[in-house]
Amino acid sequence: MVKNQIFSLKSLWSSSIFKILYCYLFTSLLLILSTWVSVNDGLSVREHIILLRLYFDTNGTTWYHNQGWKEYADCILAADGSVRKALESIDPLTGQIPQYLWADHFSQLDNNKTLYKIIHNQIQGHKVVICNAFGITCEDRINLTGIDLSNNNLKGNITPYLPYLLHLRNLNLSNNHLSGCFPDGLLKAQSLVALDLSYNNISCTLSLADSKAISYIDISHNHLTGYFKNVWKTPNLLFLDLSFNKLYGTILKEFFRQKSLDYVNLSSNQLIGFLPILSKSRISYLNISNNRLIGNITLLTCWKAGSLRIFDAENNMFEGALPESIFDHSPLQYVNLKGNIVKDPLPSILDCAKSEVKIIVPDGLKQNKCDPKVSSNWVLILNPLGEEFNIVGSDFGINSKSINIQFQNGLHCVDNVTTIIKSNTIISCKNPQGRNSTYLKLTIPTGEPGNFTVIKQQLYYYRPIIKSCSKVYKNIGGEITILGSHLESFNKTSNGKKMITVSIGNIKNSFTNVTSSINSDGFSGEVISCRNADIITPDMITCSIPSNTNLQQPAEIQIIIDGITAYVPIDSTRPHFLYKGVYNKDITISKPTEYNQTITISVPNETIIDMDQVVRVLIDDNDDSICKNIQHINKTSIQCLPYSETCGSNVKVTLVTKYGEPQFTTSLNYPPPIITRVTQGIDSTSNSIITINGKFLKTGGKRNLSIKINDTICCPLYNEYYYKQDELDDDNNNNNNNNNNSTTDINNNNNIIKNNNLIKEEQILCYYQINQSLPIHLNLPVTLTLSNQTVVKNNIYSQTNSTCPNNCVKHRTNGCRSGICECYPNLTGPSCDENIPESTISNFSNYLPDFILSFPKFITNNTFNIKFLSISEVNESGNIVDRFCSLNNNNNNNNNNNNKNNNNNNNDSNNEKEVVEDEEEDLDYSSQNDNNNINNNNNENNNENKLNWKLINQTKTTNALYTLKIKKKNVTLDILISSDNNQHREVYFAGEVIQVPKSSIELIVNLKGKWLFKDPKNQLKFNFLVKPVNDHDYSLCLPSPFVLISDEPFRWITMDVDSSTIFAKPSNRFLLNNYLVRVIEPNYKLSDSNLTLNLYYQFNQTTLKQQDNHGDDNSDNSIKYTEDSLKFRIDFSTFNSRREINPKPRGCFKDNTHKFPYDYYIVFFGCASGLILVLVICIVQCSRIESRQRKQIIKSFKATQKMPVEIKTPLLPPSFHFNFLDYNNMDLNNNNNNNNNNNNNNNNNNNNNNNNNNNNNNNNNFNDGSDTFNNNNKKNLNYEDNCDTVGFDGKENDIKNINNKKDEKEDDGDDDDDEDDDEYEDDTQPCSSGNSSRSKGSDGGSSSNSLSSDKQSFNNGNENNSIIPENKKKHLTIINKK
């Protein structure tokens, strides 16, 4: 029992404890919440002070609507003098606080809890709510979010502190009389969303906009000046109006790149320059009127802005004609070009669209009238199933709703919808289904209200087309499927079936143009009608063939739908009906040793198959894959040539006879694939394209190819052919190239190469995707499976010595074969020696300066041919005045002209054809002015105008010097070609250091003598030809070059062909009579066939130093000459560029990795130098800003009294520095500052001076006698009988009461301290009403900071200084004073 009572008491006690704890926690939570609510119930101190500043700065008493503002201002100012001080501290007129300290100042205000309580208590006591005042919007009465005082008669300067309202989202002060400068930082406020200061008198410059929140800015109709700032970091800005200001400068393209910008008004300013690109902007309203912008009206990009609706450019300096495509891309509704120079006539589209678009142009311009027409050479062919079709013409207007299209049968476009694809020229609609219309009518408005033009246009429909037919067994029959297009019937018979008939047989005449049905008289032999013909889909028809038919093979197919005979192709793809074949093991086929080789098909005897009856041989049972050129040897054998893509093993061959079932075998076998080498090795850092070279790699267009590298699948891409030259001795090759050029005949049209030293080789490309989790090995096997034939190439990357793998790894490439290390890099330009392959130069011609650049054999066989074509004199218009061309000469010079005119130059016909095809104008040895008389000139005169090149000083196969004499101009032209470069090096030419890559070709052109110009304004032009001589079979896609010119400082010209790149780099300077002259950048031009590149180097009189003809008194002074020597340099080099996957149509691939060459060291050095320069600039700028701030602080707070001589007191504590921003340490309850420490009496000579003589270190100087200070120190002290004048200079902007601070803190709640304060106030002798004493430093530098709360008192009777404890200072002071 006792135990139970004890247990119950314990339980009661424990429950009571929990209840007490629970009540305690709940009470604490309530207190915390109430404290938080009381503290945050109201605006912050900064918001109150800035609102008061706004009210007083704009003369709030004169506002039209100031409900709640006057009561609010009077209530707060009546609270305490500290509020007025805080308000005066940010008075713009006095400027006590510098601008760069405003942010810190407002932060101190927000942290001043005493000032917040004073304002909060005063507002709650008078029940004043500023959030209810006119124009104020608050969020839960805590944050100020909106100020709208528009049209309210605000006068005076705009408050500069508005950017420091941290929660302000909307500010509207428009239509007032505000003046002053635009508040700095207002457009940087991160909370501001909408700003409207329009229709005021605000001046100065516009601050930088850097805010992610702002979306609306209207500062129009003010007096803003300065440069228009284009850097607007406002990604969400929608509306911007800066019109009617005084902004000047240009509009940069970055300004319109803001994605959200929709409305822009920059009218009535002083902007100059061009209108930036607007094609990618989303602006719908753009007003730039009354500025000084310039540009070509035709080329303005605003016509291509996809969202622009309003465009006002009145009173600018635009010039040009309005384009016909003005409405192609922009939905314009208003265009104003008045006050510009608009050329006439105006396009007709303006007349057609004047009812939809308002266009204002200068008066008196001619206008082309709107005359809708359909293009005469346009044929309208419709899909009977109904689909979108286009009508091409002119003057269709821009409003598709006003265009009506009606067909012959009375129907309109589907859904009666007409669309304008291209304004004024192309309209589109969807035709209804059927074939029962022969024309349509277009009704188009002419621009005048109520006037329309009706156009009748004939139309056609697509005929049904037969593409293929399935097979059935002869004796069994069955259902066949016929595939095609437009196989749809729209008419029905009386019994409700579709009107379709299918007939199969041998037809006497072709019925490809038959428009009506035919009877059995049109056939020969047996003719059947396919039963139960039905249209399954518009592309498929099915019908049934009866059994035991005996159709002659191959049989024709005839389909008639709605009385229209289906079209059957008449070429080799013509579809036929054939019976299904049966397997015959007795058929034998010879085994070909090469592709495209004739095969022999045989049977043991004619009873099995009579070979004379074979009419067709099918490969792979495909009607399109037939064996061509069938030759009947006898009744048991035939020969034929399989179609070009036949390859693989166990190929099916079907023999079709006139009558009887086709029979087939699968005994056609080509040799298995052979892998000779694998190039384009695996990259260890990214995916790669692997090239497999070999023989019998043809896939035949079938998906029967599988490639694996080790165990990873390499995705097959495509295969192609190229010609690989046998590995012959280099010397023999060079001799063959130089001595017997006629052995090689390249026909670019037929892709045929005739050379005994060239054999055919095949390639297969595959995409290898690396596995990051697996290491890269150099010794990987390749497994290739093609048409059930598998070949494995083990150790494809095997090495025979240690040097090879080291080099391969070093160069980040893989590949060695036959004991030869193949380290082939994937290059993007010349960078260093080890990454540059060894290109070779060959094929020097004896007749003209040319050479061939080629890659190493293991990379590619692509080559480039560079030739010097001509030297010309052209006039200002670019027309050729004199030209001397490099054509191949015959050994018999007397027959040169005849051979040229007849195009029968036998020795070098190929080169001559290349030059004639690549040059855009007819080439001639002589001047064009002499063309009319060339046939009348004798041989001597003809020889005088020819370029008879001579090849001299050819000591090596890689060097050649060409020279010629142009007798007519009395000049000599030398061209030096050299490729003897074994390393990447720098050469010095024409005062310039040129980077020359390894294995490059140097070409130096030297014109010696004085070139006689026919006109001093003419120019001298050198022409070079760059042509790819590729050995690939480009039947799939042509090797179209891609040309680019790099930026400074490299100035490379690149020409990409397939996987190869040639780099051409001219020197930046040239030598003119040993004087350095800046060269003009070369230009280029692709030929019409896009296969060759013409490089031009042109020199005019601004670069060529010219002089009069000396020594000839009778010479024409207008004729000028070049100097004695003109020399310039060009460097060529070839590189293999890395392949990447970028599919193009027809299976072609484009390499997008070509980059311009650069030197990594130069780039790195440039970046490092730039970074160091930026750091130095930042350090200097920061030092300047810090120095400027320090000077401003010193200037802002000048001391008004010099300091006395310091008395060093080692026992004193460190000095306390006064922070004028710290309002927490000020005594805000004492406005008169109780001058208890300033009771100096001139009659008392033994008075202690420790309370008045404070130095800069806050040390209290004690004077034990009357003669302590010398005369100089006495002069520095300004003692007066009246304490009102002691150290007071009358300036209101100085720091007040710095000697009279209290000892206790503001938040101390000690009652004893309050009593002590009362006693202290009663015993002190204050100065006259509210004036506070100030102490002036002895040096006039800084104000003394001796605070009464920090003051050190000393014992008068003791010579040793003793520090009084803080809690007894005031009591001791009171006792001493008493």
Curated annotation (Swiss-Prot):
It comes from the Eukaryota. Residues 886-946 form a coiled coil. Residues 891-945, 1227-1378 are annotated as: Disordered. The chain crosses the membrane at residues 17-37, 1160-1180. Keywords: Coiled coil, Glycoprotein, Leucine-rich repeat, Membrane, Repeat, Transmembrane, Transmembrane helix. Residues 1289-1304 have a biased composition (Basic and acidic residues). Residues 1354-1364 have a biased composition (Polar residues). Gene3D superfamilies: Ribonuclease Inhibitor (3.80.10.10). It is a multi-pass membrane protein. One of its GO terms (cellular component) is membrane. Glycans are attached at residues 59, 112, 143, 172, 201, 265, 287, 296, 416, 436, 451, 491, 513, 596, 605, 634, 704, 710, 740-741, 771, 788, 801, 826, 843, 861, 875, 907, 953, 970, 1090, 1100, 1331, 1360. LRR repeats lie at residues 143-165, 167-188, 191-212, 213-235, 236-257, 260-281, 282-304, 307-329, 331-353. Residues 891-909, 929-945, 1227-1276, 1328-1353 have a biased composition (Low complexity). Residues 915-924, 1305-1324 have a biased composition (Acidic residues). It is found in: Membrane. This is S-cell enriched with leucine-rich repeat-containing protein slrA. It comes from Dictyostelium discoideum.
